[in-house]
């Protein structure tokens, strides 16, 4: 009987122990939080690459953010923050930012933090924003025109007059062409000729004292003439000249040309007379020459009508004219000798045969 009671008591104790096993205070259910990687939502602009890695440990959140931004040209990259919090999170951010900017640019990077429970998050963000800039052309304007062909008529002979009130002070009549030596794309050198169009040329100038000035402006360039009056020698001459223009020659490596010369003494004529020359070349520099064809110029003591005074020929025309005159005189004398010889041969003899 005693054994039965002991056996029943042991059985009841065993059943009671199994029934309360789930409520054992010493047994604890554990929820394991695995390591995780959080990729925040990032709004990317063109040319921006962002990589963010977040690792979870235990107690305190330390975030190190290194941002390198290189911007060329007007670029704006913005990353809006996204924060989701569950539980207690302690964040100690450390941010190192390096920005190199060439041109106006704005870059804003905000971190994204996600926390679950008591966690320590060490996000490492390496963000690089690169925006290619733009290249401005060295020549923003359209290419200049090709040089005009050599003229075959008198249409390119311009008549340019500058008047101070009602009194003209400079009168220029000529066909103007500019010769330049330019470098070709292959590294060689070549001469190019551009002819001035009178219909597209604007005349300006000044008539101050003994230094009259004439400025001819045309598309893509201008010519400047400065004259000097020598009252002691009673002459006037060209003392200064400058040229600047853009023209596109075949296979040229450049199209902007400029030169000036302030030590000239050309186109000299007596006061009150006009200077005339069939072809006068002015050297502004070894690579820039100005040719004045069929030239007629007067820069002092012009009448109110602006008509040219007595013509004063250039030395080159006089040197050609003198041999021509001498040759014509000799040719005339030879013709007279031949005519006299023919007349004598035709005259009958004064003696008659017996």
Curated annotation (Swiss-Prot):
Q: Where is the composition biased (Basic residues)?
A: 52-61
For side Extracellular, which residue ranges?
22-319
Keywords of the record, alphabetical order, are: Cell membrane, Disulfide bond, Endosome, Glycoprotein, Lysosome, Membrane, Repeat, Signal, Transmembrane, Transmembrane helix
Location of the region described as 2 X 30 AA tandem repeats in the Swiss-Prot/TrEMBL record: 70-129
Stretches of Polar residues bias are at 85-102, 121-135
Query: Where is region (Disordered) located?
Result: 40-162
Region annotation (Mucin-like) maps to 23-140
Q: Which GO biological-process labels does this protein carry?
A: autocrine signaling; cellular response to lipopolysaccharide; cellular response to nutrient levels; cellular response to oxidised low-density lipoprotein particle stimulus; establishment of protein localization to organelle; inflammatory response to antigenic stimulus; negative regulation of dendritic cell antigen processing and presentation; response to ethanol
Q: List the disulfide bonds.
A: 169-207, 277-314
Residues on Cytoplasmic side: 345-354
Q: Where is the composition biased (Low complexity)?
A: 40-51, 62-84, 103-117
Q: Where is composition skewed (Pro residues) in this entry?
A: 140-150
* Mapped sequence repeat ranges: 70-99, 100-129
Q: Give the glycosylated residues.
A: 88, 96, 118, 126, 164, 199, 246, 261, 279
Task: Check the UniProt entry and state the signal peptide residues, or none.
Answer: 1-21
Function comment: Could play a role in phagocytic activities of tissue macrophages, both in intracellular lysosomal metabolism and extracellular cell-cell and cell-pathogen interactions. Binds to tissue- and organ-specific lectins or selectins, allowing homing of macrophage subsets to particular sites. Rapid recirculation of CD68 from endosomes and lysosomes to the plasma membrane may allow macrophages to crawl over selectin-bearing substrates or other cells.
Per the record, the similarity remark reads: Belongs to the LAMP family.
Name of the protein in its database record = Macrosialin
Name the species this protein comes from: Homo sapiens (Human)
What is this protein's gene name?
CD68
């Amino acid at each position: 009987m005693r054994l039965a009671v002991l056996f029943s008591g042991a059985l009841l104790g065993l059943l009671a122990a199994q029934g309360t096993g789930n409520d054992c205070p010493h047994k604890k259910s554990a929820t394991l939080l695995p390591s995780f990687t959080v990729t925040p939502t990032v709004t990317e602009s063109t040319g921006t690459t962002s990589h963010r890695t977040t690792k979870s440990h235990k107690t305190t959140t330390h975030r190190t953010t290194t941002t390198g931004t290189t911007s060329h040209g007007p670029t704006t990259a913005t990353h809006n923050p996204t924060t989701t919090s569950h539980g207690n999170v302690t964040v100690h951010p450390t941010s190192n930012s390096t920005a190199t900017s060439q041109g106006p640019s704005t870059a804003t990077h905000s971190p994204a933090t996600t926390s679950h429970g008591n966690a320590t998050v060490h996000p490492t963000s390496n963000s690089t924003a690169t925006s290619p800039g733009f290249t401005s052309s060295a020549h923003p304007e359209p290419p200049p025109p090709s040089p005009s062909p050599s003229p075959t008529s008198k249409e390119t002979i311009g008549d340019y007059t500058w008047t101070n009130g009602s009194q003209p002070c400079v009168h220029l009549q000529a066909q103007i062409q500019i010769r330049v030596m330019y470098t070709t794309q292959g590294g060689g050198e070549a001469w190019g000729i551009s002819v001035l169009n009178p219909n597209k040329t604007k005349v300006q100038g000044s008539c101050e004292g003994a230094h009259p000035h004439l400025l001819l402006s045309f598309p893509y360039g201008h010519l400047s003439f400065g004259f000097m009056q020598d009252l002691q020698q009673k002459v006037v001459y060209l003392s200064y000249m400058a040229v600047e223009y853009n023209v596109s020659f075949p296979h040229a490596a450049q199209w902007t040309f400029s030169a000036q010369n302030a030590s000239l003494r050309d186109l000299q004529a007596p006061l009150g007379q006009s200077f005339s020359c069939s072809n006068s070349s002015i050297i502004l520099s070894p690579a820039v020459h100005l040719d004045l064809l069929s030239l007629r110029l007067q820069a002092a003591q012009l009448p109110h009508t602006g008509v040219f005074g007595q013509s004063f020929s250039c030395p080159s025309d006089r040197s050609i004219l003198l041999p021509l005159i001498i040759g014509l005189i000799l040719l005339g004398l030879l013709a007279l000798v031949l005519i006299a010889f023919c007349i004598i041969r035709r005259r009958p003899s004064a003696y008659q045969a017996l």
